[in-house]
Amino acid sequence: MEKNKLTIGSYYLAPYASTPEHVRDLAQCGIDVVVNMRNDRAALDLLAQNGVSAIVSGIIPGWFGGDGSNAGTMSEQNPLEKYEVAAERFEDHPAIIGIDAGDEPSSLDFPHYGKAIDVIHRRFPGKFAYLNIYPSYAVKGSNMPEEIAAQLGAVSYHEYIERYVRSVDTPYICF
């Protein structure tokens, strides 16, 4: 992605919209990149033909923080070896500019995410490592302190962001 240009992204391209007409419309609307794109070669071909890039999901082991019930277990469920195997199997495509690493993790998983992002940087050269964290309003239930801590893995959103910055080497924060 160019730093001197505002990049406009769209989240997800549904299978029914993976037609020449839909993708052409997407490009004509000024969309530069589709985030959470599936690794569908025909759809990626259409994106490339229309000058639209993709941050692709499903290349590496996925992770979703959800309600926090799985907080702190990412390293057990997605050991770094799985990322190495995924890199060995990866088939590049001109439309792919990034690898989707996951969505809304607990800060308890940030240390492992830091290592996973390092693997992405090393094993997928030239690809953007994309990680979306919880937005500030994304606490479940009644926002009681124990619910915040369970979901974010931190006592406040400020602490959640601080932990991200300390643990995960990305040039951005996406929420």
Language model feature labels by segment:
Residues 1-175:
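Glycan-processing catalytic domains of CAZymes
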